[in-house]
Amino acid sequence: MTKNIHDQRILILDFGSQYTQLVARRVREIGVYCELWSWDVEEADIREFNPDGIILSGGPESVTEENSPRAPQYVFDSGVPVLGVCYGMQTMAEQLGGKVAGSNEREFGYAQVKVSGESAIFKDLEATQDVWMSHGDKVVEIPADFVKVGETDTCPYAAMANEEKKYYGVQFHPEVTHTKGGLQMLENFVLGVCGCERLWTSESIIEDAVARIKEQVGDDEVILGLSGGVDSSVVAMLVHRAIGDKLTCVFVDNGLLRLNEGQQVMDMFGDKFGLNIIKVDAEERFLEALKGKSDPEEKRKTIGHVFVDVFDEESKKLKNAKWLAQGTIYPDVIESAASKTGKAHVIKSHHNVGGLPDDMEMGLVEPLRELFKDEVRKIGLELGLPYNMLYRHPFPGPGLGVRVLGEIKKEYCDLLRRADAIFIEELHAADLYDKVSQAFTVFLPVRSVGVMGDGRKYDWVVSLRAVETIDFMTAHWAHLPYDFLGKVSNRIINEVEGISRVVYDISGKPPATIEWE
């Protein structure tokens, strides 16, 4: 490796926008490392991080309010290029001597920015830009050493620049796909203005992670809880590439997995990739612990506690394991840090965000803790994991434990597994699987009268659920073709003995959640 992939870096200060993580993902897509910190970070931390550029995010506050967030003064004293986005532009303008005012006209949605003059931020872009706005306040007077470089019909200063100091502000959101030239604008800032190189690639991330794992664990042995999900699977491949047979994976089959999932995990990681895997068949133990429990939160906690107990028991059998590998990813770190400190800046600390016992007396190996989910999937492909596994729809940690409503019984899980497998199989066959964001089946603990041949039956009901979403914060129910739904329903009722009725969930989020429990 010729250059350290962390040497060139962008700092993003978070003012609370729902799009802030998207800004970070876009910078990473461009090929440059970045971190996301809270707006009120200490000057010493910025100095230590030594960024090549700083981006001030959007946010829900109003600069006109007395105690609203402000960028640390050092941001403007550091000599580093700065890009302010939406609220970030407003606080930049106000802090550097301009004026911001509230507006009676809130600008939300599409707008056309007329680019004026020549600015590095709009290099190689047309004079009119379709952008995405989301603001109430607006800059009404720019600082003395700035020039206007963009406007809309209702926003006189949609973009401003101080080319000498390399300060730029845009009132719109370049990070969202609705802003057609947004990625080019971010590239212009990150690569052009800040002078960064594209060092952050899937290949370089893997090379860096493998080197760091080797340096961290040396000749010690490592244990990993392998679930077959995206994160733990990619961790398994990375750690195995670094230390080979010194990695032992523990796969706990809790009886709450999808059809044949346990065997698929063993076939792929044991037979195909040659990893050391211990399979623990703990179905009876989980079902016994869940007996009589119908409250969703109680079920979740029970499943979590039993998993920890089982994993702890297995880890103690591996006397030489000194390290625990986990699939912690960057959003976990941000969320965990924010909940503990109110700030999103603790990427270097190694707190346990995975819920495993604090007394395990093992060091943590977390090779994905700097990565977003889309980056994890990309390096998974590079490591040889199959596309259909990496891009599978999300599956909840408690598994079928939250897709069987009420009390969990083996009979219910077995019926649900088979019904769900039919639904997913038909989605693939109809080329619909990748057109929906998440699809699954839910077991309802109610019986319904049905007719089979000349006889009547009184059997269980399942609900099909399919949604379309960008961020899983909001979702629309998927308008699947009636003929398709009819085919799935007929197959389930005819092929899964014990189910007499199939319904389709047409609830959006909000008001409903995506999962039923």
From Swiss-Prot:
Q: Which keywords belong to this entry?
A: ATP-binding, Glutamine amidotransferase, GMP biosynthesis, Ligase, Nucleotide-binding, Purine biosynthesis
Reactions catalysed, as given in the entry? XMP + L-glutamine + ATP + H2O = GMP + L-glutamate + AMP + diphosphate + 2 H(+)
Which organism does this record belong to? Vibrio parahaemolyticus serotype O3:K6 (strain RIMD 2210633)
The free-text function statement in the UniProt record for this protein reads:
Catalyzes the synthesis of GMP from XMP.
Catalytic residues, chain numbering:
86, 173, 175
Q: Write out the residues that bind ATP.
A: 227-233
Give its E.C. classification number.
6.3.5.2
Q: Which SUPFAM superfamilies match?
A: Adenine nucleotide alpha hydrolases-like (SSF52402), Class I glutamine amidotransferase-like (SSF52317), GMP synthetase C-terminal dimerisation domain (SSF54810)
- Pathway named in the protein's UniProt entry: Purine metabolism; GMP biosynthesis; GMP from XMP (L-Gln route): step 1/1
The record's annotation in PANTHER family points to: GMP SYNTHASE [GLUTAMINE-HYDROLYZING], GMP SYNTHASE-RELATED
Identify the HAMAP family for this entry. Answer: GMP_synthase (MF_00344)
Question: Hey, what's the signal peptide range on this chain?
Answer: none
> Subunit details for this protein?
Homodimer.
User: What positions does the domain Glutamine amidotransferase type-1 occupy?
Assistant: 9-199
Q: What highest taxon heads this organism's lineage? A: Bacteria
Taking every annotated instance into account, which residue ranges of this chain make up the domain GMPS ATP-PPase? 200-392
A Pfam short name: GMP_synt_C
Its protein name is GMP synthase [glutamine-hydrolyzing]
Instruction: List cellular component terms (GO).
Output: cytosol
Q: Which GO terms describe its molecular function?
A: ATP binding; GMP synthase activity
